[in-house]
Every structure is written in C-alpha cells, then in structure tokens.
Amino acid sequence: MLILHNISRDKHNSNYNTPQEVEQSDGPLSFDGVYYNVYLNQGLLEGRDVTLFVMGDHVGKTNKFDIGQPLERYCDWNQIMELVEIYNCRLGWHSWSHRDLTTLSEQEILREVIPPIPMDVFAYPYGKFNEKVIEAVKIAGFKEAYSVTEGDGSEYQRLRAYL
C-alpha cells in the first residue's frame, strides 16, 4: 500500500504528490488525514483501491500541528463520506490527535485509538508502535494496522511505502 498526503501541481516537499504521479502509481493507495486537495482531485480515485485514514480532532480543520509543513485544510466529515460512497474508499483511523502513541499511558492510547464509528484498519501516527499500542489497537477492534517505519507483514505490523 502506498501512502500519500497531498495532491498538488506544486510539489512543496515529499508530502506532496502531483496528479500525474498519482495517476501513474500502481497498487492500493492510502491518504493520511484526508486533505481537502484530495477531495479537489477526487477523479484520481476512480477505479482505485483507496483507504482514507482520518484523524478525528483535525477533520474539517488545518494541519497547524504539523510544524514545518505548509498550512493545508483537511476534509470535513461530509466530504470524507462522499469520497467513501462515490469511490468505495475504505475508511480507516489515524487516531484522534496524531500524537506519538508510544509515549502515552495505556488509558491515553485507548482514548486515541477508539474511533467514533466502527473501522477495520488503523494507521499508526508517525508509523510508531510498540506492544502496548498494538494491544490497544486490537482492543479497539481493528483487523489490521499499518506503519511507515517498520513492519513484519502480520495483521498489526503491515508496512506502507511513500509514493
């Protein structure tokens, strides 16, 4: 599975992919945070296997927490659900606040990983996880979890690659 964040003609940094790069990519795609520019370029999702990883506290807001990145807006719930319905995207969870879960207590981890609606797939913020985090993800009912830093291919240690 490939990981993407933003779709833009202007490639500000590695968190941005051009529409042409997305069109030419092979395999399943995943979008972290579901930026509004994904919604604006939604035609690129047609016929693709796409997972949208949502961060609850940031839905409809900006990425102001993401120091060093250009300020961008995330989709709101209506836009996210429209993408799910029109393009048959899978809805995944990326925590409420996007904090490093490995630094939190067990109770805090559980609060972060339990989504507002049932979802089957989770993406670890910053790709970081440990046994406490994996256990919380299992308790929350997820069937799979993805990282961008490491993984052994098992259900809760699947690896995504940057496009």
Please provide the spans of the model-predicted regions.
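A short alpha/beta connector and helix-capping loop motif
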Residues: 39-57
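Histidine-centered divalent metal-coordination motifs
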Residues: 5, 94, 98
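Aromatic- and acidic-residue-enriched segments that line the glycan-binding/catalytic groove
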Residues: 60-75
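Surface-exposed, active-site-proximal loop segments in enzymatic domains
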Residues: 65-66, 101-103
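Acidic (Asp/Glu)-rich catalytic clusters
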Residues: 43-48, 73-92, 138
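Short, catalytically relevant binding-site loops at active-site mouths
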Residues: 36, 57-60, 97-99, 129
